[in-house]
């Protein structure tokens, strides 16, 4: 059985479990090595959904599960440390967050972390969009004001 099989919207079972707030299923899928970096048809990863839920206080347990299984060498458990590591280490398979994703989602805390760690705020992606483009397009006033 393929734990990372995708449906017609490119969502994996992990995407669905997170969106349905099924903490026990998320934990089980992560134990079986579900990939939290697979993007669905909207370009969003399970880690992104988990972070969104945790950021808005809907369900921090799911975010803790994802970060626990994706911790660096199994030693990093503090969620802020995990954010920093994930944001700055593109070699890890489960990284979804970058400057553009943070701007699109309005994660000002993460934008600050990325920029203060030396990332270029004016960097453009393959679509010639900057972080500001994504913030405006997504109507994230917090990110635009940052």
From Swiss-Prot:
Repeat (ANK) residue spans along the chain: 9-38, 42-79, 94-126, 127-145
Keyword Ion transport assigned: no
One Pfam family cited in the UniProt record for this chain: Ank_4
Naturally occurring in which organism (per UniProt): Fowlpox virus (strain NVSL) (FPV)
Entry keyword Membrane: no
InterPro entries membership: Ankyrin_rpt, Ankyrin_rpt-contain_sf
Swiss-Prot/TrEMBL keywords: ANK repeat, Repeat
PANTHER family cross-referenced by the UniProt entry: ANKYRIN REPEAT AND PROTEIN KINASE DOMAIN-CONTAINING PROTEIN (PTHR24198), ANKYRIN REPEAT-CONTAINING PROTEIN-RELATED (PTHR24198:SF165)
Name the record gives this protein: Putative ankyrin repeat protein FPV224
């Amino acid at each position: 059985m393929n734990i990372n099989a995708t449906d017609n919207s490119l969502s994996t079972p992990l995407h669905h479990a997170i969106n349905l707030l099924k903490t026990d299923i998320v934990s089980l899928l992560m134990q079986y090595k579900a990939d939290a970096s697979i993007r669905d048809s909207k370009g969003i990863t399970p880690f992104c959904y988990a972070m969104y839920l945790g950021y808005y206080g809907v369900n921090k347990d799911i975010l803790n599960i994802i970060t626990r299984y994706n911790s660096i060498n199994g030693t990093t458990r503090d969620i802020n440390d995990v954010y920093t590591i994930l944001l700055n280490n593109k070699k890890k398979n489960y990284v979804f967050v970058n400057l553009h994703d943070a701007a699109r989602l309005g994660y000002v805390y993460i934008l600050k972390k990325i920029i203060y760690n030396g990332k270029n705020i004016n960097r453009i992606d393959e679509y010639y969009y900057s972080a500001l483009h994504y913030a405006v397009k997504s109507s994230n006033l917090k990110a635009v004001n940052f």
